[in-house]
Amino acid sequence: MSQTLAAVEGSLGSIGYGLAAIGPGVGVGIIFGNGTQAMARQPEAAGLIRANQILGFAFCEALALIGLVMPFVYGY
C-alpha cells in the first residue's frame, strides 16, 4: 500500500512542476515576441532592447529553476 502512495506522490510532483513551468514558458515567449517587435519598430534602439530582453529572459528562467529545485530542498 505504501509503495502505491509513494508512486502517486512522485507523479503529482512531476505534474505540479510541469504546470509551474507553463508560466515562465509563456513569459519567455512574450518577452522575445515583444522585443522582436520593438526592434523592428525602432532599429536604432536594438542594443538596449536586446539587453533588456536577455535580462527578462534570465528572470523568467530563474523562476523555472527555483520551481525545479524547491521539491529537492523541502524533500517532497
UniProtKB/Swiss-Prot annotation:
One of its GO terms (cellular component) is plasma membrane. It comes from the Bacteria. Coiled coil: none annotated. GO terms for molecular function: lipid binding; proton-transporting ATP synthase activity, rotational mechanism. It is a multi-pass membrane protein. The record marks 61 as: Reversibly protonated during proton transport. Keywords: ATP synthesis, Cell membrane, CF(0), Hydrogen ion transport, Ion transport, Lipid-binding, Membrane, Transmembrane, Transmembrane helix, Transport. The keyword Hydrolase does not apply. The keyword Metal-binding does not apply. GO terms for biological process: proton motive force-driven ATP synthesis. It is found in: Cell membrane. Pfam families: ATP-synt_C (PF00137). The chain crosses the membrane at residues 12-32, 54-74. InterPro entries: ATP_synth_csu_bac/chlpt (IPR005953), ATP_synth_F0_csu (IPR000454), ATP_synth_F0_csu_DDCD_BS (IPR020537), ATP_synth_F0_csu_sf (IPR038662), ATPase_proteolipid_c-like_dom (IPR002379), F/V-ATP_Csub_sf (IPR035921). F(1)F(0) ATP synthase produces ATP from ADP in the presence of a proton or sodium gradient. F-type ATPases consist of two structural domains, F(1) containing the extramembraneous catalytic core and F(0) containing the membrane proton channel, linked together by a central stalk and a peripheral stalk. During catalysis, ATP synthesis in the catalytic domain of F(1) is coupled via a rotary mechanism of the central stalk subunits to proton translocation. Key component of the F(0) channel; it plays a direct role in translocation across the membrane. A homomeric c-ring of between 10-14 subunits forms the central stalk rotor element with the F(1) delta and epsilon subunits. F-type ATPases have 2 components, F(1) - the catalytic core - and F(0) - the membrane proton channel. F(1) has five subunits: alpha(3), beta(3), gamma(1), delta(1), epsilon(1). F(0) has three main subunits: a(1), b(2) and c(10-14). The alpha and beta chains form an alternating ring which encloses part of the gamma chain. F(1) is attached to F(0) by a central stalk formed by the gamma and epsilon chains, while a peripheral stalk is formed by the delta and b chains. Belongs to the ATPase C chain family. PANTHER family: ATP SYNTHASE LIPID-BINDING PROTEIN, MITOCHONDRIAL (PTHR10031), ATPASE PROTEIN 9 (PTHR10031:SF0). NCBIfam families: ATP_synt_c (TIGR01260). This is ATP synthase subunit c. It comes from Streptomyces coelicolor (strain ATCC BAA-471 / A3(2) / M145).
